[in-house]
Amino acid sequence: VGSHNGLKYDTDEFLIAGGGRPLIYATYITLLDKGDKVIYPVPSWNNNHYTHLSFCEKIEVETQPENNFMPTAAEIAPHIQEATLIALCSPLNPTGTAFSKSALAEICDLVVAENKRRSPDQKPLYILYDQLYWTLTFGETHHYDPVSLRPELRDYVIYIDGLSKAFSATGVRVGWSFGPKYIIDKMKS
């Protein structure tokens, strides 16, 4: 992760599992309580199911072709104060489109501002960042991630990654998650 993405995480801030799917679900059940709200774009892969299985409420942001089927800060902003989790994926499954640097930075700025606004007795706003397809970017498409753009988000971002897509080995179910140690520890338990 450090040599490819420039992110610095200790080994105890990683969790390895049989693919990305159990890690996404572990993130949901670790961070969310019944009735919490989750923001995610549509189309997207299985966030509706994870939200349902976690007994949470969905806030679906319908993406638009003119935005490359990626959610924008303007679309997310009206819902941000009521949410506990924003589930993002870049490149996005199923469209294959990716965040531009500026579009992701704007969403990150919303999360930074919202977490500063929240009182200590409120849950923070987290980002689940599924980047399983990041190695499959070509040409002028570049991969960006929240903590590289806004290091102050480090305590609020849980990454999902894996090797099956990058190596065209979809039968090899190896995924990893990394993020704040206290969250990864809860996911492990």
Which role does the model predict for each range below?
Residues 1-122, 134-151:
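Conserved core of the PLP fold type I
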Residues 96, 125, 161:
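Glycine- and other small-residue-rich loops at beta-strand/loop junctions that grip anionic moieties
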Residues 14, 125, 157:
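Short, conserved active-site loop motifs that form the nucleotide-linked donor/cofactor pocket
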Residues 150-189:
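Conserved core segment of the aminotransferase class I/II
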Residues 90, 127-128:
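Residue-level marker for buried hydrophobic side chains located in beta-strands
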Residues 131:
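Walker B catalytic acidic pair
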